[in-house]
Amino acid sequence: MTNKTYKIAVLPGDGIGPEVMEQAHKVLDAIEKKHAISFSREQHDVGGIAIDNHGCPLPESTVKGCEESDAVLFGSVGGPKWEHLPPNDQPERGALLPLRKHFQLFCNLRPAQIHKGLENFSPLRADISERGFDIVVVRELTGGIYFGQPKGREGEGPQEKAYDTEIYHRYEIERIAKIAFESARLRNKNVYSIDKANVLQSSILWREVVEEVAKGYPDVTLNHMYIDNATMQLIKDPSQFDVMLCSNIFGDIISDECAMITGSMGMLPSASLNESNFGLYEPAGGSAPDIAGKNIANPVAQILSAALMLRYSLGEEEAAQSIEAAVSKALSAGELTADLAGDKPALTTSAMGDKIAEYILNS
C-alpha cells in the first residue's frame, strides 16, 4: 500500500517553540512508521526569529509556505527581546493575527481534560477533580465584539465615552455551530451553547440559529446555558460538559477557565480552522522565554496539537488517537516533565518526546 503524503508547514517560532517542536517531529516520525502516512515538512520563520532574520514577524515566504501546505504546525512566538517594538510589529500581534485573517480561520478548538494521575494539579476540590472531565471549547474567532464596527472613543471630561459593537451574522453562527455538532458526534453527543440571550440581541439570534442547526443532528443533545452560569458550573461540576459552543468573547473567557481548572497549561493543544478544514495547530500556552533552551519545557501540548492536526485537517483519526493514547500512557506511568513532577525525578523535554514516540512504535 502506497503511503499518503501530507505537506506540513512547520513554524517553530521563539522561546521554547523550537525544542517542543522537535518532540512533535519525533512523534510524527513514529506515526510514519506505524501508519501508511508520510509527512513532507518545511520549516519557516515566524515571530521574533522572523523579525531578526527578515525584518518582520510574518515574512511573505512563510505565508507562501503555509498556502502550499495541508496544515500549519505552529510553535510559539514572542519574548522580552521584541517587547520594545510598536504593538502591531511585535511577534504575537504581527504574526498570529495576520495568519488567522489571511487563512480566514473562524473556528478555534480548545480541548481541556484532566489526565489520569494528574488530578492533584487541578485547583478544584479533590472530589470534583477526581471525577475528571474532557471538554472541547468551540469558539467563533472572527466575529463578535472584538471586530464589530463602530468602535472607538470620543468626547472629553465627564462626557468622554468608549464603545464597541457586538455583531453576528446568521452565516457566522451556522458554520461554527455545525463544527460543534460534528465534534460532538465524535465524542459524547452533547453540545452546550453558551450565550446571554436574556439580555443581548446578538445572543437571541445565536440561540435561534443554533436551535435550527441542531435539527440536522437529532443524535446530538443541545443544551443552552447563560455565560455567567456556565463559568460557575465549570467550577462546580466540569464533568457535565462535552462540547461548549461559544461566541468570540465568551469562548475567550471559557477556554481560559477550562485551561486553568486542568492545572496544567503545558498540556493543552489548540486548533484554528477555516471552512476548508485547513488549520493552524499550536499549544495554548506561550513561548516561556524564561525556560527556553534548558530542555525542561513540557512538549505535550505541541505533541497533542499534532494529533489535532491529524484529526481535523488530515482526517487521520486512527493516527490522532495513537498519539493521544501514547501521551496518556506516559502520563499515567508517572513519566512527567519538571512542571508536573514535583519532588519526583523529572524527564527532560527530549526524553518526554522519546518516551511518547516509543509508546507509539510499541503500540
Curated annotation (Swiss-Prot):
It catalyses: (2R,3S)-3-isopropylmalate + NAD(+) = 4-methyl-2-oxopentanoate + CO2 + NADH. The keyword Cell membrane does not apply. The record marks Y146, K196 as: Important for catalysis. InterPro entries: IsoCit/isopropylmalate_DH_CS, IsoPropMal-DH-like_dom, Isopropylmalate_DH. GO terms for molecular function: 3-isopropylmalate dehydrogenase activity; magnesium ion binding; NAD binding. Keywords: Amino-acid biosynthesis, Branched-chain amino acid biosynthesis, Cytoplasm, Leucine biosynthesis, Magnesium, Manganese, Metal-binding, NAD, Oxidoreductase. NAD(+) binds at residues 79-92, 286-298. Binds 1 Mg(2+) or Mn(2+) ion per subunit. Pathway: Amino-acid biosynthesis; L-leucine biosynthesis; L-leucine from 3-methyl-2-oxobutanoate: step 3/4. Coiled coil: none annotated. It is found in: Cytoplasm. One of its GO terms (biological process) is L-leucine biosynthetic process. Pfam families: Iso_dh (PF00180). Its EC number is 1.1.1.85. Homodimer. Catalyzes the oxidation of 3-carboxy-2-hydroxy-4-methylpentanoate (3-isopropylmalate) to 3-carboxy-4-methyl-2-oxopentanoate. The product decarboxylates to 4-methyl-2 oxopentanoate. Belongs to the isocitrate and isopropylmalate dehydrogenases family. LeuB type 1 subfamily. HAMAP family: LeuB_type1 (MF_01033). This is 3-isopropylmalate dehydrogenase. The lineage of its organism: Bacteria, Pseudomonadati, Pseudomonadota, Gammaproteobacteria, Vibrionales.
